[in-house]
Amino acid sequence: MRIVKGDKVKYLDLEGVVISNPYMYITDMENYIDVYFSKVKETMTLKINDLEKVD
């Protein structure tokens, strides 16, 4: 399932923390995605495999 901007995602390495509606910038379509965390006002580059979509 493809993750797109505005999706709620769960970052699996952070004990399943739900990131609500992050701003995402694709860096490398296959492997990496930049996610802006509004709570900590920080952009992190994460592996797409470490993210899980939340309904």
Predicted regions located by residue number:
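Basic/aromatic-rich interaction segments and small domains that mediate binding to polyanionic partners
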Residues: M1-D55
